[in-house]
Each structure stands twice: as structure tokens, then as C-alpha cells.
Amino acid sequence: MSNGTDSKTASAPPARSGGGFGGGGSRGGDRGDRGDRGGDRGDRGGGLGGDDDKRGGGRGFGRKKVCRFCAEKNASVDFKDQATLKYFVTERGKIIPRRISGNCAKHQREVAVAIKRARGIALLPYNAVVG
């Protein structure tokens, strides 16, 4: 079954140029032709690996955040207590996440519900106070 071309001598299909979903555009070439574009990822250590010693270490502290509601047994989450709830809201009116506030999951959920209730009865603003 020979039709004039041998599979061993057949050339590669022609390269696509431009258009389509390939993202090639009219610039030509493929990603292998880019070379070093002078980015600073190498300077910052953009990889995911460890080896913090070559960059000067990680954080300067290792103190674990503790949930203040678990630490103080008499502290409770109350939607009417504006002073406590303002500690868990940013200046823009967003609820501070658990990894920053240090709350446990249970009390973070209670704080979020309390903030939403306080907003509903106008004790806390929904958004930032402009002025």
C-alpha cells in the first residue's frame, strides 16, 4: 500500500501560525523560543520548595495565635457588644479571616454570625465609613 509517500520520509505537519485558541498570535515561534525574559522570580525565590536558609529565614516569630474566646472562659460572642466585634472587622467593613484573627473554627463562625446580626440592626456598618 504505497501512495507515493513513505511513512519514514514523511515530513512533519506544517507549523500553525496565528489565530485560534493556541495563543500563538502573529508573533510566531513557540514557548521554547522565549528564552529568559528578565523576570525577577529567580531573585525572589519563586519556587515552592523549602531551603529558607538561603533567603534569610522565614518569619521572625513562632508564636501561635490563640482564640481569645477559648482562652478567656468568661468571654462570649455577643452581637450587641460592638467593642468586641469591631476587633474582627477591617476599616473597609470586611470580616477578618480566621488565620489572621486567631479564632478557632467554632468561634469564628459565631463571630461571623454576630457581625451579620449587628449589621442587620445597624450596630455595625456594612461597609467602610467614608470621611
Curated annotation (Swiss-Prot):
Lineage: superkingdom: Bacteria
Keywords assigned: Ribonucleoprotein, Ribosomal protein, RNA-binding, rRNA-binding
Signal peptide range: none
Single GO biological process annotation from the record: translation
Sample GO molecular function, one term: structural constituent of ribosome
Gly residues bias spans: 17-27
GO cellular component, one term: cytosolic small ribosomal subunit
Record's compositionally biased regions (Polar residues): 1-10
Region (Disordered) residue spans: 1-60
Residue spans of biased composition, Basic and acidic residues class: 28-44
Subunit structure: Part of the 30S ribosomal subunit. Forms a tight heterodimer with protein bS6.
Family from the record: Belongs to the bacterial ribosomal protein bS18 family.
Role this protein plays: Binds as a heterodimer with protein bS6 to the central domain of the 16S rRNA, where it helps stabilize the platform of the 30S subunit.
Protein name: Small ribosomal subunit protein bS18
